[in-house]
Design a protein with these regions (language model features):
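N-terminal helix-turn-helix DNA-binding module of bacterial transcription factors
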Residues: 1-56, 324-327
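Short, solvent-exposed amphipathic alpha-helices that sit
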Residues: 32, 70-85, 161-165, 187-206, ...
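N-terminal helix-turn-helix/winged-helix DNA-binding helices
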Residues: 38-71, 75-77, 85-86, 108-111
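Structural motif
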Residues: 88-111, 162, 211-233
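Flexible loop/hinge segments that line or gate small-molecule binding clefts
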Residues: 97, 119-164, 245, 267-279
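Periplasmic-binding protein-like
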Residues: 113-121, 178-181, 212, 233-246, ...
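Hydrophobic alpha-helical segments within soluble ligand-binding/sensing domains
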Residues: 152-179, 194, 198, 202, ...
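Flexible loop/turn connectors
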Residues: 223, 227-327
């Protein structure tokens, strides 16, 4: 608070009164204090004590796409495991793939003076976090990088995983391999598409843009994609699904399709190994993704000021049956 008081030309006691909305502060004085808080990158928060160096609210913030998605539920569990070990609680919110909602949640968590912030980006503009970071709030991005901000980032090997999926299908005789991914503006979808194209090159196969579709996965959009990819003389004999949600909709759409194409899913999901045939997946430890990001965040909270890091976690192919179907 001393920095705010110095800039506003008032006492620390006056700053405390303004932050706590106490009466008997002249409006012009309060305006100077609030302007100083904004200039220094602070936010009005739950108490003046949070402006003091070294204070803690015992919380961290986590912004994900959708807490109802099992992928993010598992990621949240990993974050909570680490946070609990440090005596912190996790505030979690869903952006619903909306960049403005992401911004609102992140800034609301910062206004509550979380000790650190974890963000799965919904957009590519994150300059709004610069004042918070300058004010001392550590920020780590996970699953996707920030578009315009150099910051700690924890990812999985999207590129390598899809390359491996293509190689696996090619080894089983497939030459017409399709890719169905999430929306084109999503980092993981574009990276997995890039891996798909690279995998085709490595396997000596031609890229056919008609067999690569990116779209927001809904029951209707995936059913339409199946019609496009799996009918006609140039149909695909194998499909790589870009994430768990795409796979679930794809399985529903394939229920009455014959012959069934080979299928590899990027992301494992519950009961995948019990289906008929069991689903071959590019698996990775989602809980580990959350833990790795949280561990990096707490390193920053505890004073690690080394340059921003990019951590890429490995993936692995789990052959179960659907990816081994012959053309």
């Amino acid at each position: 608070m001393s920095d705010v008081a110095r800039l506003a030309g008032v006492s620390i006691k006056t700053v405390s009164r303004v932050v706590n909305d106490e009466p008997a502060v002249h409006p012009e004085t309060a305006g100077r204090v609030l302007a100083a808080i904004e200039q220094l990158g602070f936010r009005r928060n739950l108490g003046a004590r949070n402006l003091r160096r070294g204070s803690t609210t015992g919380t961290i913030g986590l912004v994900v796409e959708d807490v109802g998605n099992p992928f993010y539920s598992e990621l949240n569990r990993g974050v909570e495991q680490v946070a609990t070990s440090f005596g912190r609680h996790v505030l979690t919110g869903s952006s619903n793939e909306n960049s403005e909602r992401e911004r609102e949640l992140a800034l609301e968590f910062c206004a509550r003076r979380v000790d650190g912030l974890l963000v799965v980006p919904a957009g590519t503009q994150h300059g709004y976090l610069v004042p918070e970071m300058r004010a001392g709030t550590p920020v780590v991005f996970l699953d996707r990088p920030a578009g315009d901000l150099v910051a700690d980032t924890v990812l999985v090997d999207n590129l390598g995983g899809t390359i491996e999926a293509v190689a696996h299908l090619a080894q089983h005789g497939h030459r017409r391999i399709a890719f169905l991914g999430d929306g084109p503006g999503i980092f993981t979808a574009s990276e997995r598409l890039r891996g798909f194209r690279e995998g085709l090159v490595r396997a000596g196969l031609r890229y056919d843009e008609r067999l690569a579709l990116l779209r927001t996965p809904t029951r209707e959009s995936v059913a339409d994609a199946v019609d496009r990819l799996l009918t006609g003389p140039g149909r695909a004999t194998a499909v790589i699904a870009g994430n768990n949600r795409v796979t679930v909709h794809l399985l529903r759409a394939l229920a009455h399709v014959t012959p069934r194409p080979a299928l590899v899913s990027f992301d494992d999901f519950e009961l995948a190994d019990l289906l008929d045939p069991p689903v071959t997946v590019i698996g990775h430890d989602v809980g580990r993704l959350g833990r790795a990001a949280a561990e990096l965040l707490f390193a920053r909270i505890h004073g690690d000021d080394s340059p921003p890091r990019k951590v890429v976690l490995p993936v692995h192919l789990l052959p179960r049956g659907s990816g081994e179907v012959a053309p």
